[in-house]
Regions:
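Short, surface-exposed connector motifs at secondary-structure boundaries
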Residues: 58-62, 82-88, 149-153
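Acidic (Asp/Glu)-rich catalytic clusters
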Residues: 53-56, 84, 103-110, 141-146, ...
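Alpha-helical membrane-targeting segments
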Residues: 1-27
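Canonical radical SAM enzyme core domain
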Residues: 43-51, 67-109, 117-122, 130-136, ...
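N-terminal pre-triad scaffold of radical SAM enzymes
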Residues: 17-52, 60-65, 241-248, 258
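Hydrophobic residues within beta-strands of alpha/beta enzymes
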Residues: 62, 90-91, 113, 180-184
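Radical SAM enzyme [4Fe-4S]-AdoMet core and its adjacent flexible, acidic
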Residues: 1, 116-118, 122-246, 251, ...
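Residue-level detection of beta-strand scaffold positions
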Residues: 34-40, 49-52, 96-104, 148-149, ...
Length: 258
């Protein structure tokens, strides 16, 4: 799977700035709930001030999710404004309405249409369909690929998810020739009983190794706490410049594998 060099550089710089505390309050990735920004029945935003705050965000990546963003008439305008401001956008959707609304978006290098796949999710039976993905989502992915869009799949794992089910989703993603894959724990599972939470974390880490890209693995780790709304972790006060330089060099080494 491919990982944009520009995104690699932006995330590396954001992580270094965060560890050096040059950008207080900023994360490499910021979550945006479409329902808090856009009206469900109008293309106008709820607040122009909120739009300005989002566009002015110091986070290089904005992840738009929440209740289905494609339900909002103004989502394409919001995405266009954010990408034009220099941010990368991951627009998460179930994919059900993707084919219907794909014509409203522009296939730019800073936009990843991100289709969420969950094992065990209801879907119509079809001989050409793998478990965990609806036919409409698959059709949407194919239509987006043909239109030149970058596609990422977001695989969410729950405690009951079997690795065999997750493997089928990975196989589906590769068969559709997607550009990237993010794997995270399902929302709401971070507060499970400790043994269950540890088992899920271990299962998620194991699944990420199957992505085949250290950069998409890294992005998965960065995205997960943002999606789960976990508190931001702060670097140790004793973090040295030498240690940060070593991490930066390790990041640079990883570029050649992207």
């Amino acid at each position: 799977m491919r990982f944009p060099l520009r995104l690699t550089a932006d995330l590396t710089m954001a992580r270094l700035a965060q560890k050096l505390r040059l950008r207080r309050g900023a994360r490499p990735i910021q979550f945006v709930d479409a329902a808090e920004i856009l009206h469900p029945d109008s293309s106008h935003p709820v607040s122009h001030e909120k739009i300005r705050d989002i566009i002015g965000s110091r986070s290089p990546v904005l992840w738009i999710g929440g209740s289905e963003p494609l339900h909002h008439p103004g989502i394409a305008h919001l995405v266009r404004a954010i990408t034009q401001s220099g941010h990368f956008v991951f627009l998460e959707t179930t994919g059900t309405f993707l084919r219907r609304r794909i014509h409203e978006f522009q296939p730019v290098s800073r936009l990843f249409l991100t289709v969420r796949l969950e094992s065990g999710a209801p879907h119509r039976a079809s001989s050409g369909l793998r478990p965990g993905a609806s036919e409409l989502a698959v059709e949407g992915i194919r239509a987006a690929r043909l239109s030149g869009f970058l596609i990422c799949v977001h695989v969410r794992l729950a405690p009951e998810t079997e690795m065999s089910d997750a493997a089928k989703l990975f196989h589906l993603a590769h068969s559709l020739d997607v550009d990237g894959c993010v794997i995270s724990r399902a929302c709401g599972e971070s507060n499970s009983a400790l043994p269950a939470a540890q088992a899920l974390s271990q299962k998620t880490a194991e699944a990420r190794k199957r992505i085949g890209s250290i950069w998409w693995e890294s992005l998965s780790r960065l995205v997960e706490p943002v999606l789960l709304r976990e508190p931001r972790s702060q670097p140790p006060t004793g973090t040295s410049a030498v240690h940060l330089e070593h991490e930066a060099r390790a990041d640079e080494e990883g570029i050649k594998f992207a």
